[in-house]
Amino acid sequence: MTPPSATETAPSLQGGLKMSVTDKSGPDRVKRNELAELEIASQMGAPDVYIDAERGTEWYLWKGSIYVKPLRFENRSGLYVIVLKTDPRAELGKHRHRGEVRAYTVRGNWGYHEYEWTGKPGDYITEMPGTIHTLWMGEGSEVMFNVVGSIEFFNDDNTLRETLDSFSFWRMYVEHCQERGIKPNEKLWY
């Protein structure tokens, strides 16, 4: 896209924004830059995505009594967004994250045996890459996790048991959908 000349009107963007380009400096220049950046975002950016939590994805049993509901898979960065829930108290083995994890407590309580805090509804937690801990979830808990990269699970003797990433959680979701005779929602990849 070529920039408008000093006498042209920039194209309408983002709900009808228009501007007259008459000066190469000052407030008009800022507006021109903002409009140019909005145009770049509309042409090059990813679209907004809505996932219906009831019809756009499925809970599946993962480990023990812990269920997973996938909300997003992104193959460029390795990001995946999942919700974990359990009815009885549950634990997930000792594991290490190779990327950052962000968590939001929807309901119940949860934490890691290695830490003193307990997540409760509304709490937000950030975990740094390389941390090793053992997840516990209280009865009736539900937590949304934004995970980047892989998770390595360890045996009791600290040997590596398995490595999971976005492709692993997608595979488990697809297998669950196939067992139920439903089509996996490919729009979860964005």
Stretches with model-predicted labels:
Residues 113-134:
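Short acidic-glycine-tyrosine-enriched beta hairpin
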Residues 87-88, 97-114:
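Glycine- and acidic-residue-biased ligand/ion/polar-headgroup-sensing regions
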Residues 2-78, 163-164, 170-172, 176-190:
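A short, N-terminal "cap"/entry segment at the start of jelly-roll beta-barrel domains
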Residues 96-98, 117-118, 137-139:
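Short glycine/proline-enriched turns and hinge-like loops at secondary-structure junctions
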Residues 83-86, 105-108, 124, 135, ...:
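Short, well-ordered beta-strand segments in beta-rich or mixed alpha/beta enzyme
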Residues 90-92, 108-112, 124, 151:
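Short beta-strand segments in beta-sandwich/barrel cores
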Residues 65, 70-96, 128-131:
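Conserved short histidine dyad/triad with adjacent acidic residue
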